[in-house]
Amino acid sequence: MGGKYKKQWACVTLFSLITAALCGACGNVMTGASGNVPETEAAGQVQPDGDLPAWQTYADDPVTLDWYINYSWFSTPWGENLVSQTITEETGVDIHFITPLGNESEKLNALIASDSLPDLITLGWWEPQVSEMTENGMVYALNELADSYDPYFWEVSDPVAVNWYTTDNGNIYAYPNSSITPQDVEQCEDLSSNQTFLVRKDIYEAIGSPDMTTPEGFCAAVKKAAEMFPEVDGEPLIPIGAHVFDNEGNVSFDKYLMNFLAIPWEKDGVYYDRYTDPEYFRWLKVFRQLGEEGYLANDIFVDTRTQMEEKVAQGRYFCMLYQYSDMLTQQKILYANDPDSIYMAVEGPRNANGDDPLRPTTTINGWTVTLISKNCKHPERAIAFLDYLMSEHAQLLTYLGVEGVTYDIKDGKPVLRDNIKQILDTDRAAYDREYGADDAYWMLQDNVMQLQWKQEPSPATAQLEEWGRKYVVYNGQYDVVFDSGSKEASEEDKITKLWSQTLPALLMAPSEEEFDTLFEEFIEKRDELGYTDVMEKKTAYMNSAKEKLGIQ
């Protein structure tokens, strides 16, 4: 049964009409080169049985594939835990992971420039290298590999995602994980957004569980928390936490804050300039004022992700706009030490009207995409391996592990064993080393399909997961990535870099007058860099995407 129909089962029902509406879909707007499926080295090997998924035929024919993961933080090894060993046993495929040691873009660009891309490549769907690799003929067309070596692809892939990622030449080169459609959001009550406003539970309750939705309430709460709890276990309290500052800005202080303030993505059929919205401007000034008074610690401007995760695990932050899914491991550490020291989700900053926040889940684009390089000597094994990972069998394996070892079937449903749940809830690193389920290998995860096996949440994370289902919206029609090398891509890159330099300067501005001057300079420079042209192109893309997604 195909991946799409598994989604329908999990969500009660999904609309099939979107499949037809997405034919010739836009996705990442790129043309692409022909796949040119080669004669492979499989000539002397076992050939797949047309009646079976190819991975079953290849199980006794070992091969190693190199897989580049474009995230320096990814460190789960292959071959040492139950899930990866089971996958290798079932498919014959051993994996050698390659990850960047430093800057992700520099590493991937070097691989592209030297024509040394490994067999498989996984990166964010929005990254410019996706279109670069496609347009330069560096990756195979997945549909051509499927037709030549493994038609099982058409059974396990989601036709909506396939249509969305199909390029103008009729080929699909990249397949997403975590792909969610507007209909999924409408029909699946358990879908959530991981964008949350978090507070440390014991501190928040000690200061009276205040309303932090207004600037006045927010400032008062931050100041009272810092006054009552200047230190946490001998270390200074960090009143306000955030994601890391990077070459795009800081999602906590831009995109997430805008979403909590319910700032729209469009107005009157035109892509909206969220950065100049009065509500966003007002709240940025709130944070600037707090910074002037000493409540924005230097740590948040310089810390790496690893450093921040360490401080979350120590409970050093009072509050933060943060993706709760990025701190579940640290949350469980806090819970094990003191259940009252965990973070809880509460109502965060709101606009002057008190409107509900707009909390997006992932979209039809997904999170990452995976491609097969033309350097791959065994593309027939690569496509069969991806098809395996898309299947319901592998989704259950990568999510819950192996029946009889990590879970049992009770009343027709898989249930994690108590000892497995205990280690998962208390020591994620040890769990990954020994078992490697719970989407440790997330590259082809299907969140909607996995809803049918959803387990009772850990008491450490239950409140976060429950709150995450509030105010969920779909915003994939606004996800725009211009073709690598295009005029618009160059203009937007320069504007984004300018914003990444401006945002910390705004927050650290010594006065409101300096803030205003910096912001005016940003707007002026942004216009000079081609902002009007970029927004016109985004509006055109948005309207096209809405039509193809069936969104009014």
Feature locations, PLM:
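Bacterial N-terminal signal peptides that target proteins for export
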Residues: G2-V12
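Conserved N-terminal structural module of periplasmic/extracytoplasmic solute-binding proteins
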Residues: C11, C26-G217, G249-K255, I263-E266, ...
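Loop/turn elements at helix/coil->beta-strand transitions in domains of secreted/extracellular proteins
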Residues: D61-L65, T91-I95, D115-D119, M138-Y140, ...
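Extracytoplasmic/periplasmic substrate-binding proteins
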Residues: S72, S131-E132, H243-E266, R288-M443
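Helix-loop-helix "hinge/cap" segment bordering the ligand-binding cleft or interdomain interface
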Residues: N143, N171, P176-E248, E266-K311, ...
